[in-house]
């Protein structure tokens, strides 16, 4: 990957999507070390850009994750993301989504959550995750409007399914309760401070 373009041979387009939308960036986030991490869903690539040099310092391209969303660097330096599992033509109809934490020094998984059976947790688009200060992970299974929290041991602490159905601008998802992403905020966090009822 060069500074101003992606080599299509090195980072090929996912075979399930149209060429007209080669990359489909769905995450651009600042890391704790001030670098920037970007995720391109349609070619299964995430990359970290050095804030000072503007050069790519790390990348991962792996179709096994079936496209992904909400890529983020954790305080421990690992990378957390929602692996959609969208490529059923490769992985088979009995696979599903997962939330994955990898060590970017070797791109090895250090933690993951998936459904049991695998198809009990699946969202082929949107969705996200957040590592909480408790060590638990908040998960948004966007396709089904499901929010839930799991412990490091992968036990579900609580879950919520949105009862709100809306018209979505896609013929396959009209009249659904999809949720793009979710976040948990402390009551005194700057995002919601002074907005909560007394």
Q: Could you say what each language-model-derived stretch is?
A:
Residues 1-198:
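Histidine-/acidic-rich catalytic cores in large beta-rich domains
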